[in-house]
Amino acid sequence: MLVIDELHNVLAGNSVNRREFLNLLRFLGNELRIPLVGVGTREAYLAIRSDDQLENRFEPVMLPLWEANDDCYSLLASFAASFPLRRRSSIATPDMARYLLTRSEGTIGELAHLLIAAAVAAAESGEEAINHRTLSMTDYAGPSERRRQFERELM
């Protein structure tokens, strides 16, 4: 299996480069006879749709946003266990999950950025645990906030 992450970046190239890349994907699928998995945003799907043969080889699957449930608590517990902090980070709770998911807008990549920033703040401050205090110390801005900041700068 060949997993291609950030597949939407194919759209960054010019039309000739895009076509060459899509041809390469088709060639790899045919020659290697292995499944291809493309991961990316909505734009990744649009790039694949531009080639009829490739579109038939990919089945789009939408990943849902994370919700505060047992799977999420397990994910948060795994994150907490992975950070080299001296104190236990109690982030795998319903209240903390809702707070974290609201700030990260429910995506795992944003959640990881937020928690890494909080772990750094916890270590640098001597707190040695992720909690509301260390989360408020981060300079993390979620996707919507970053867009608003960018749009303000354009004005």
Where in this protein do the model-derived segments appear?
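C-terminal alpha-helical "lid" subdomain
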Residues: 69-70, 78-155
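The catalytic "switch" region of P-loop NTPases
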Residues: 9-14, 18-91, 95
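Walker B catalytic acidic pair
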Residues: 5-7
